[in-house]
Curated annotation (Swiss-Prot):
Superkingdom, natural source: Bacteria
GO cellular component: cytosol
Pfam families per record: DUF150_C (PF17384), RimP_N (PF02576)
Lineage: Bacteria, Bacillati, Bacillota, Bacilli, Lactobacillales
Function as written in the Swiss-Prot or TrEMBL entry: Required for maturation of 30S ribosomal subunits.
Database matches in PANTHER family: RIBOSOME MATURATION FACTOR RIMP
GO biological process: ribosomal small subunit assembly; translation
CDD domains given in the database record: YlxS_C
Organism of this sequence: Streptococcus thermophilus (strain ATCC BAA-491 / LMD-9)
Protein name from the UniProt record: Ribosome maturation factor RimP
Subcellular location: Cytoplasm
Keywords (A to Z) from UniProt: Cytoplasm, Ribosome biogenesis
Length: 157
């Protein structure tokens, strides 16, 4: 059900996001007794509180136009930045992340490892090449894109 809502909201909201903003992700989840619709937006240099207020004024009325109403319960709209650990949900997002430190979770393990964290050296649209630390040694792994369950930027400590 929530994926259907996300798909409907994405179809309505994505075309309305003006340049230079980028729709990064949409999440719909229940937190406690509240439903939260999170619309994650970014732009070069990051977004401000004023940006989120302006975008909320664009997005909120659009959500009211979706018929029939896809939301089974009342929800809170949250427009925000994706933060430091932004999700990398598209091939384009992964291409833009080359050279950055990322976290990748896999559907099935490679060499008994299901989560890799390291520098994304390359992404050709089909394979991610990551330099990661295995104990004290740097290793390189090639990960087929179709085996990626989730990817996001990560903070290197």
């Amino acid at each position: 059900m929530s994926q259907k809502i996300i798909d409907l909201v994405t179809a309505v909201v994505a075309p309305a996001i003006p340049d230079p903003y980028e729709l990064v992700d949409i999440e719909y989840e229940k937190i406690g007794s509240d439903y939260i619709l999170s619309v994650l937006i970014d732009k070069p240099g990051g977004i401000t509180v004023e940006d989120t207020a302006d975008l909320t004024e664009i997005i909120s009325p659009l959500l009211d136009t979706i018929q029939p109403d896809p939301f089974p319960d009342q929800y809170m709209l949250e427009v925000s930045s994706p933060g430091l650990e932004r999700p990398l949900k598209t091939k384009e997002a992964l291409k833009n992340a080359v050279g950055q430190y990322i976290n990748v979770s896999l559907y099935k393990a490679i060499d008994k490892i299901k989560i890799f964290q390291g520098d994304l050296l390359a992404f050709d649209g089909e394979t991610l090449t990551i330099d990661y630390l295995d104990k004290t040694r740097h290793k390189t792994v090639e990960i087929p894109y179709q085996t990626v369950a989730k990817a996001r930027l990560a903070v290197k400590l």
